[in-house]
Amino acid sequence: MAKDLRGVMPALLTPFDNQQKLDIESLRRLVRFNIAQGIDGLYVGGSTGEAFVQSRAEREQVLEIVAEEAKGKVTLIAHVGTVSTEESQQLASAAHRYGFDAVSAVTPFYYPFSFEEHCDHYRAIIDSAEGLPMVVYNIPALSGVKLTLDQINTLVTLPGVGALKQTSGDLYQMEQIRRAHPDLVLYNGYDEIFASGLLAGADGGIGSTYNIMGWRYQGIVKALQEGDVAKAQHLQTECNKVIDLLIKTGVFRGLKTVLHYMDVVSVPLCRKPFSPVDEKYLPELKALAQQLMQERG
């Protein structure tokens, strides 16, 4: 089971229309576009997917649509985390019902929960997932939950946990986790250190910019497997040039704008309170879309 979870997996964006409603046709196109890139799986309903500005019904609808398009073609991981254990359990049940391969959940946030409360939260979700492995999602910069190494070690050894999405930027900690848990599936979370994360022990990655250049990240994996560190470094540099621009524009809206210019996403808007891309960046984003389309062929 754990073997199937390894690889390069875009953190899927969620397209919306001009009325801020889910854009189902754009979502279907985006799933097909990602699969055509040769990625290994999709991570659905996470931070990149703007899950926390969606209702539970909307999140379930996204899971259903993605499963219709991708089940049996690539590995599917449903992020079901919310601050509410009950709602997370309901989403986990939906993920099982729609045929996902695993569930994932960010640490519960906003309130200062005790570590034992975090553990109980994960146990409850795992029970509701009916046998699907859990991918623990550690992202302290957004969750505000700063887990110690000992706490991470405890979480990843809970019955039912099969993987960790490590979005902390701490490569030393990544290596420590790998050393302590050689059989754990370990994902690099920050795209800008993907190659370094692999060298520190990650089995693959889950990232937002994979939506527009997943083949580059697959190229990094292949280069390192072949011992070509220079090629991996070159590809990481090319990815980071894109990330530099997206950080200026706002990552999610920048990605949607690039995908709009690629004729994948109809409306390049995130859900409010996110604002649209500043128009001054549109020429650069359009040029990036053209460059990536030419590179991909």
Swiss-Prot record:
Keyword Transmembrane among record annotations: no
Residues that coordinate or bind aceneuramate: S47, T48, T167, G189, D191, E192, S208
Reactions performed catalytically: aceneuramate = aldehydo-N-acetyl-D-mannosamine + pyruvate
Ranges in a coiled coil: none
The enzyme's E.C. designation: 4.1.3.3
Keywords: Carbohydrate metabolism, Cytoplasm, Lyase, Schiff base
Alphabetized CDD domains for the sequence: NAL
Subcellular location: Cytoplasm
Enzyme class of the recorded protein, top EC level: lyase
Top-rank taxon, per record: Bacteria
Any single biological process term in GO: N-acetylneuraminate catabolic process
Catalytic site: Y137, K165
Alphabetical list of SMART domains matching this protein: DHDPS
NCBIfam families: nanA, PRK04147.1
Entry similarity comment: Belongs to the DapA family. NanA subfamily.
PANTHER family, sorted: N-ACETYLNEURAMINATE LYASE
Function: Catalyzes the reversible aldol cleavage of N-acetylneuraminic acid (sialic acid; Neu5Ac) to form pyruvate and N-acetylmannosamine (ManNAc) via a Schiff base intermediate.
Name under which the protein is recorded: N-acetylneuraminate lyase
Gene expressing this chain: nanA
